[in-house]
């Protein structure tokens, strides 16, 4: 599952005819859930228009109500250039066979960033660092960029400290939430998709015990999924012994 970014990358004009300073914010939603996609979002705005974002009640998406996130999602899309990469569970599982989640995230972050750098390399990129070391994350991120001279501000809690990253956080969160709502139309109540959510745990356990397999919306590489499948196998052995 993916959104418009691939077409936009292929069809984008490599020059926007301007070298005015631009600001880009990057963040993700859905890194830890056992159900559903991980969404990587970027938000770009001309530096001269950054004050417009500062006038909004932007903060980390988790600190906002669903209604407020939806309202801001519309405003941000109207005000900024927004791009998203939606990585579905199957793709996450395949990539996790060869790389870890941090590298999956880094790859998506760099893909979005290079899209903007091709248009204008006079750019500052603000990004929520997804590893324990901000410097290590920044170095790995920069290594994937087509221009190593762009300014990178990679920090923990950047979604709380910089409005441009808060905006990306909101875009990512709302996009993922909408996918989860689509899932509910097919599967019924599934909760938030996080392993700690009682509704998610109940749905997943019931589904696995009824179908003897995981739903396609589950990340099979997650410990929660593996443990459930192990329970099924052990229950089969127990019934055979009886």
Swiss-Prot record:
Enzyme's top EC category:
hydrolase
Q: What is its EC number?
A: 3.1.26.4
Entry GO MF terms:
manganese ion binding; RNA binding; RNA-DNA hybrid ribonuclease activity
Reaction catalysed by this enzyme: Endonucleolytic cleavage to 5'-phosphomonoester
Q: How is the cofactor bound?
A: Manganese or magnesium. Binds 1 divalent metal ion per monomer in the absence of substrate. May bind a second metal ion after substrate binding.
InterPro entries linked to this entry: RNase_H2_suA (IPR004649), RNase_HII/HIII (IPR001352), RNase_HII/HIII_dom (IPR024567), RNase_HII_arc (IPR020787), RNase_HII_hlx-loop-hlx_cap_dom (IPR023160), RNaseH-like_sf (IPR012337), RNaseH_sf (IPR036397)
Q: Locate the RNase H type-2 domain: which residues?
A: 21-234
Q: Which residues does the record give as a divalent metal cation binding sites?
A: 27-28, 128
Gene3D superfamilies membership:
Ribonuclease H-like superfamily/Ribonuclease H (3.30.420.10), Ribonuclease hii. Domain 2 (1.10.10.460)
GO terms under biological process: DNA replication, removal of RNA primer; mismatch repair
Cellular compartment(s): Cytoplasm
Task: Name its co-factor(s).
Answer: Mn(2+); Mg(2+)
- Enumerate the UniProt keywords alphabetically: Cytoplasm, Endonuclease, Hydrolase, Manganese, Metal-binding, Nuclease
Q: Name one GO cellular component term.
A: ribonuclease H2 complex
- NCBIfam families from the UniProt entry: ribonuclease HII
Family affiliation: Belongs to the RNase HII family.
Primary role: Endonuclease that specifically degrades the RNA of RNA-DNA hybrids.
Which PANTHER family would you find in this protein's record? RIBONUCLEASE (PTHR10954:SF23), RIBONUCLEASE H2 SUBUNIT A (PTHR10954)
What is this protein's name? Ribonuclease HII
The organism named in the record is Methanococcus maripaludis (strain DSM 14266 / JCM 13030 / NBRC 101832 / S2 / LL)
Gene name, Swiss-Prot/TrEMBL? rnhB
């Amino acid at each position: 599952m993916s959104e418009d970014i691939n077409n936009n990358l292929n069809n984008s004009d490599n020059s926007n005819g301007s070298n005015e300073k631009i600001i880009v914010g990057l963040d993700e939603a859905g890194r830890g859930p056992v159900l559903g996609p991980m969404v990587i979002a970027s938000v770009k705005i001309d530096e001269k228009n950054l004050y417009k974002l500062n006038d909004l009640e932007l903060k980390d998406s988790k600190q906002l109500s669903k209604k407020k996130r939806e309202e801001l999602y519309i405003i941000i899309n109207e005000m900024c250039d927004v791009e998203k990469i939606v990585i579905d569970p199957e793709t996450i599982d395949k990539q996790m066979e060869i790389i870890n989640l941090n590298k999956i995230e880094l790859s998506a972050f760099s893909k979005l960033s290079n899209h903007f750098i091709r248009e204008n390399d006079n750019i500052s990129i603000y990004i929520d660092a997804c590893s324990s070391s901000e410097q290590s994350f920044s170095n790995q991120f920069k290594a994937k960029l087509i221009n190593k001279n762009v300014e990178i501000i990679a920090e923990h809690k950047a979604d709380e400290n910089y409005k441009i990253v808060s905006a990306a956080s909101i875009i990512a969160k709302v996009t993922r939430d909408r996918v989860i709502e689509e899932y509910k139309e097919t599967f019924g109540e599934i909760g938030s998709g996080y392993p700690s959510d009682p509704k998610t745990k109940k749905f997943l356990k019931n589904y696995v015990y009824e179908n003897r397999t995981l739903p396609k919306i589950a990340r099979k590489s997650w410990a929660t999924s593996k443990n459930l499948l192990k329970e099924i196998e052990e229950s089969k052995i127990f019934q055979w012994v009886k």
